[in-house]
Amino acid sequence: MTARKVVEGFDGLVNTHAQSIRGFEIPMNWNSPTHPEFLTTDGRRLPVNRVFCIAKNYEEHAKEMGGEVDRKAPFHFQKSFDALTVGPEVRYPTQTDDLHHEVELVAVLGQGGRHLSLKDAEATIFGYAVGLDFTRRDRQAEAKEKGRPWEIAKNFDDAGVIGVVTPKTEIGLMEHAAISLDVNGETRQSGNIDQMAYNTVELIAFLSTLQELKAGDLVFTGTPSGVGSVIRGDHLVGKIDGLQDLPMTLI
């Protein structure tokens, strides 16, 4: 098929289904995306912007995954904002037989900026919440083996869960707090956020060197060791001292 035939075929498709590509006439209901909202302890509902996730930020978790903490710079990936949910029911994803839990401290930004100093990075923090980062561990292993990105393992419906956000004005800068996850009443993960290789302020400052951060951005700061599989029907409770618990059930 010649290039001209391809172009003519595309033009015909556009004319049939969209009338005019220049006018962006869309023959369907195309609504603006709805950003999920998180709830604060003082009753506000605020929209999520972007979701940044830090990997291998606890030494023992890095070891249990067969790796090590990168001491040169944090390693991060992103989830789509619409992959986030507040629960309490969380959908078990398709395309996996090995879904893993990862409890995390989440920092919520109230303002942003570029190339932030540590002082300015601290000032961007609006508050904190307990979060869960779910992983298709079998698909992640496949991606690692082939040298591919982790997106298939980390980005899907209900791939991230965020609890009620406690403003920093209520709790201060969080540097030391026990963090844990219970599954069906049994503690699976346990640690302290002071075990992070890079603390929350350092993570925000680093991310600001890569792109402009904005209000509503979330930073999942990594998980302690003890990650493992969960199945439909399991009841999970994420806990961090000083923050509201995050309960959920997989359906």
Model-derived features: where do they sit?
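Residue-identity detector for glycine
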Residues: G9-G12, G23
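Extended, compositionally biased flexible segments
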Residues: I21-F126
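Catalytic-pocket segment enriched in acidic/His residues
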Residues: P27-L46, N57, H61-V69, A129, ...
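Generic detector of bulky aromatic hydrophobic side chains
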Residues: R4, D11-G12, S80-F81, P224, ...
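Short hydrophobic alpha-helical segments enriched in small aliphatic residues
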Residues: T16-A18
